[in-house]
């Protein structure tokens, strides 16, 4: 299954919010500039109908030109990083791009996942 088949599915037509996890694994190999342009235009057409699209991608699995085009045309770009600091694994969400924000945006946000609780934002890191 590729990204084209996913975008052609009936579920995409009906959804207000579209989340495609590991979208980089669905991207075709060997895309030329026209293929990249067509995919971006297709995603823009879906978004222009008032629907939101969220794609999670692994930059190492994806065509770098396509990734650059997607990041350039996205309203919001978030990067997740992990660092080992003093024996602790620190996870950080970096707000790389946020167009039309209503106010100031915190550029880095610490987070963790706790068993039984789920996703937790470190409020000491958010101002």
Predicted regions and their residues:
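Phosphate-binding/switch region of NTP-binding enzymes
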Residues: 57-118
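P-loop NTPase motor core
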Residues: 2-73, 77
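NTP-binding/hydrolysis catalytic cores, primarily Walker-type P-loop NTPases
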Residues: 9-13, 110-127
